[in-house]
């Protein structure tokens, strides 16, 4: 894995110093990471044993995650419990702040019957200079079955997958600018369940800070694999990654043109913690130029969905009347996140069991 994306001292390295070019992704570092993802993710049967990123997976594999997630809803649309991880231990390692992702993972793990440990990174030995590798090796000695990791460095989850013993599954809860695969899959599940048309007939617009967003990268990859008719990205040029046109998306700097006839409008927040300095003079200036307002929603299809991965800044990326309006599925995304994370955890654990059975027989 590229050492520019992850080294043994990554736990002490901030995103801003990891690589001066990382914010200009889709760059060569991202390409190298994506190219190497599929091998460690899958067992010999092509089933997940880690979940590190969307790239390298097939349409059938993404649909399998969606269908598995749907199996955790009853006939009334309520989530059910399923003891598929009973006896397993899951450790949640969040080196970055998180509300929705960490909490929904924990709920998912408990609904599956797992023993759940939330590691307090702020009080861990990484604060005393311990490397990520040494932290990892010490935690795996405590006989965990699954690590769920979020880290500020691109490639952290991949690094962990190559460093842990083969019987531990790694789930990527978001790594730097690189990827947020479970967010992408809960977005795909939401579109699958709520959109009035199949993926192949949809036009999806992603609006906001594309340049620094791991969500945008993973969503674009998933939408392309699932065969969406058209993907649009809408942002000021300063918030667009170099070379994004090569990924088959249509680029708009004018939101009023970009949202016309869209089936899905997906807002993103400005990632100020990754930028280091504000790119807009004031939030009201950004809202005026790029906010998702009722007037802009009206330019999309009449039954268009409004989505946002959160955290959501009302009056900056989106109007409150839109976020709380009839076309918003934002809270459904959160609930779907539990089902998707249940699916990924269950599938990765099953894939690990198959992998271990094969190793034992050879």
Swiss-Prot record:
Species assigned in the record? Psychrobacter sp. (strain PRwf-1)
Q: Which UniProt keywords apply?
A: Pyrimidine biosynthesis, Transferase
Family that this chain belongs to: Belongs to the aspartate/ornithine carbamoyltransferase superfamily. ATCase family.
Coiled-coil ranges (or none)? none
Q: What class of enzyme is it?
A: transferase
Binding of L-aspartate: at which residues? Answer: 128, 214, 269
User: How is this protein named in the record?
Assistant: Aspartate carbamoyltransferase catalytic subunit
Region annotation (Disordered) ranges: 1-22
A single GO BP: amino acid metabolic process
Reported function: Catalyzes the condensation of carbamoyl phosphate and aspartate to form carbamoyl aspartate and inorganic phosphate, the committed step in the de novo pyrimidine nucleotide biosynthesis pathway.
């Amino acid at each position: 894995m590229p050492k520019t994306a992850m080294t043994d001292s990554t736990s002490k390295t901030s995103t801003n110093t990891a690589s001066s070019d990382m914010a200009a992704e889709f760059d060569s570092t991202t390409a190298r990471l994506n190219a190497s993802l599929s091998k460690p993710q899958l067992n010999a049967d092509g089933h997940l044993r880690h979940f590190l990123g969307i790239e390298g997976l097939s349409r059938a594999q993404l649909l399998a995650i969606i269908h598995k997630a749907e199996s955790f809803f009853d006939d009334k649309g309520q989530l059910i419990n399923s003891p598929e991880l009973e006896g397993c231990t899951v450790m949640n390692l969040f080196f970055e702040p998180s509300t929705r992702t960490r909490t929904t993972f924990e709920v998912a793990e408990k609904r599956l019957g797992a023993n759940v440990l939330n590691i307090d990174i702020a009080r861990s030995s990484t604060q005393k200079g311990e490397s990520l590798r040494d932290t990892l090796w010490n935690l795996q000695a405590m006989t965990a079955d699954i690590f769920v990791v979020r880290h500020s460095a691109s490639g952290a989850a991949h690094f962990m997958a190559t460093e842990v013993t083969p019987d531990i599954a790694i789930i990527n809860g978001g790594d730097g600018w690189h990827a947020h695969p479970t967010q992408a899959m809960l977005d795909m599940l939401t579109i699958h369940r709520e959109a009035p048309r199949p993926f192949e007939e949809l036009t999806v617009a992603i609006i906001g800070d594309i340049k620094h967003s791991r969500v945008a990268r993973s969503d674009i990859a998933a939408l392309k694999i699932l065969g969406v008719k058209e993907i649009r990205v809408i942002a000021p040029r300063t918030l667009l990654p170099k070379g994004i046109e090569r990924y088959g998306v249509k680029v708009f700097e004018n939101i009023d043109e970009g949202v016309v006839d869209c089936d899905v409008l997906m807002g993103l927040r400005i990632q100020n913690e990754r930028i280091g300095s504000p790119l807009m003079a004031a939030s009201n200036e950004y809202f005026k130029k790029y906010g998702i307002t009722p007037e802009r929603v009206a330019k999309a299809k009449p039954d268009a969905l409004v989505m946002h991965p959160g955290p959501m800044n009302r009056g900056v990326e989106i109007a409150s009347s839109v976020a709380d309006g009839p076309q918003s599925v934002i809270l459904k995304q959160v609930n779907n996140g539990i089902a998707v994370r249940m699916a990924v955890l269950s599938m990765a654990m099953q894939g690990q069991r198959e992998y271990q059975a094969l190793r034992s027989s050879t």
